Amino acid sequence: MKVILCEDTDWLLSEEAFSIYASCMYHPTFEDYKKRMKDYLSDPSVKVFIYEDWGEKTGMMVLRLSNADAEIMGIAISENVRLKGIGKQLIKSVAESLKLECVRAQTDDDSIGFYRKCGFSEERIVVEYPDGSTVRYNCTLYK
């Protein structure tokens, strides 16, 4: 197992990467994914980390970095290897290697349990959208 900084733009814009990352986007098409990833790649404060096991990429985490703080823009694990601690290991490994003091994320009811298991504290908020409101959670992990 290894966690690596991925700078392979071709792979990050591939259908293989999309197949992993799509689960943390709201009903994306491949074109939606590529647009978002290109936006991430154009921002020098954003880095993409990959979880790789025996040469197979099974996890991705997109972080926006600011000094010793980071915001998780998205984290996703291949469906066939979920619930094995890969997401938690991805966060832990990157936080340790970058010596992060604080990691933040915003999530929904579907994923709040994951962040709780990783040790994040949470603040429940209601976000208004044109088609209604939804519950979200601001999650924070301090070292």
Regions found by a protein language model. Give the residues of each.
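Conserved active-site tyrosine of GNAT-family acetyltransferases
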Residues: Y115, F120
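Conserved acetyl-CoA-binding loop-helix of GNAT-fold acetyltransferases
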Residues: I77, L83-E96
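Active-site rim helix/loop that mediates acceptor-substrate recognition in acyltransferases
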Residues: C24-D53, K57
